[in-house]
Amino acid sequence: MEYGTRKLSDVYEVSEILGRGGFSVVRKGTRKSNNDDEKSQSQSKSQSQSQVAIKTLRRLGTSNNLPRKKDGGENSTETMMKFPTMRQVSVSDALLTNEILVMRRIVENVSPHPNVIDLYDVYEDTNGVHLVLELCSGGELFDRIVAQDKYSETEASTVVHQIVAGLEAIHRANIIHRDLKPENCLFLDVGKDSSLKIMDFGLSSVEEFTDPVVGLFGSIDYVSPEALSQGKITTKSDMWSLGVILYILLSGYPPFIAQNNRQKQQMILNGNFSFYEKTWKGISQSAKNLISSLLTVDPAKRPSAQELLSDPWVKGEKAKDDQMDPEIVSRLQRFNARRKLRAAAIASVWSSTIFLRTKKLKSLVGSYDLKEDEIENLRMHFKKICADRDNATLCEFEEVLKAMKMPSLIPFAARIFDLFDNNRDGTVDMREILCGFSSLKNSKGEDALRLCFQMYDTDRSGCITKEEVASMLRALPYDCLPTDITEPGKLDEIFDLMDANSDGKVTFDEFKAAMQRDSSLQDVVLS
């Protein structure tokens, strides 16, 4: 793994977006076959590195943070990859720097490992820091499970064994994942015997070396009691998360279910869960004993990953091979659909500017009021001017404002653009800007909600995808957001009320109904 003066675009063809987070974007990359770098390598590159995932993190600091070899000079074409230290970046970049530091630890102490994502290379340019990662094209853990014709404890133990093997490797390197959940476990390929990889180390920490750089946010389903109470986080915290995953794999629902978020927090802190007879009567006692040991409130009493590698159930020796009750699979399918919707939303609202975005936009443009036909014209100009129909660069955004004859807004273009360039990739979703402007006109009520919804319903089908719901939530007026939305688990509580038929899409009526059932939103949005 090396870092040199080449540009990312010299080595890789970057294509479609695979996923987005609050601070990053992941795209598919294909290694070019005619670049000088490849010719200087060994006879041929492995197939696994020809197709990669490229994760772009916004730029760390104000200068090149990846120092070069002293003997290589400024014109060295290739040098060993170095990583920025915490001193080289501002505190605001700590989260992203943390991911790079943890990935360095993985490269040095874990890779290559069949159950941990591999980092091939790192590039840095004006757009940010690019991590060239192993491409996992086999889908998420739960997606694979619910698509199987046959599902039994044996299949569940097989995937759990792989997660345990990955955890054992990173724990041996003193790395705590801190965000273990189904969406962070991906299959390498679509093959039946594909290995399962643990990925996304953005929230991870190294014991006795780095401090966790973020607090709790979003879902608390997989969060350990010690994390919830802000106690000491250790590798045993990951084992609790594994226990939650295993419980869901064997039942189709999470172990801690409550009427509201506060009750759920208390249940987790007390370790209050049950094996309901109707669901669990067909599950082996070995599996239930394993779950009970993992979901023990005292971290010291939980088994380690190393200990679990020799557990008879994890090894498949005591896992039942009988096909599970179809109702369990059906519940797992419904749970998976809701989980993916929530995950998309939580990823989208992970930014320090999100909840103040519309408020800041109002302060920038003042009393400028867009009429409905102007908003529609703005949409048309975006589509006409922008090379990528949905995403606009700063230059394209300025061209749109000029075409719309909005000279008074042009001086603020860069600042408005920056409000919506959430992952710092140099582009913004034009629909978010449209929602922001429409929110200036209608800052509350059902009309504002419907306006934002229609901005994303581009095919006028009457429903939007889970990713679009997340983006819409991100662009809603500041006044439409409940004051406790950053409270751990609050988004879970809201999104549990959406997607009533679990089809992965949300209609306006479903979205509105969820708002009506949530008193904190109802008072503000629908009053």
Curated annotation (Swiss-Prot):
It holds the Pfam family EF-hand_5. Changing S24F: In DK22; loss of nodulation and mycorrhizal infection. Belongs to the protein kinase superfamily. CAMK Ser/Thr protein kinase family. CaMK subfamily. The chain crosses the membrane at residues 239-255. Ca(2+) 3 binds at D499, N501, D503, K505, E510. Activated by calcium. Autophosphorylation may play an important role in the regulation of the kinase activity. It is found in: Membrane. The modification Phosphothreonine is found at T279. The gene is SYM9. Residues 358-379 form a coiled coil. It comes from Pisum sativum. The active site is at D179 (proton acceptor). Residues 12-314 form the Protein kinase domain. It catalyses: L-seryl-[protein] + ATP = O-phospho-L-seryl-[protein] + ADP + H(+); L-threonyl-[protein] + ATP = O-phospho-L-threonyl-[protein] + ADP + H(+). This is Calcium and calcium/calmodulin-dependent serine/threonine-protein kinase. Its EC number is 2.7.11.17. GO terms for molecular function: ATP binding; calcium ion binding; calcium/calmodulin-dependent protein kinase activity; calmodulin binding; protein serine kinase activity.
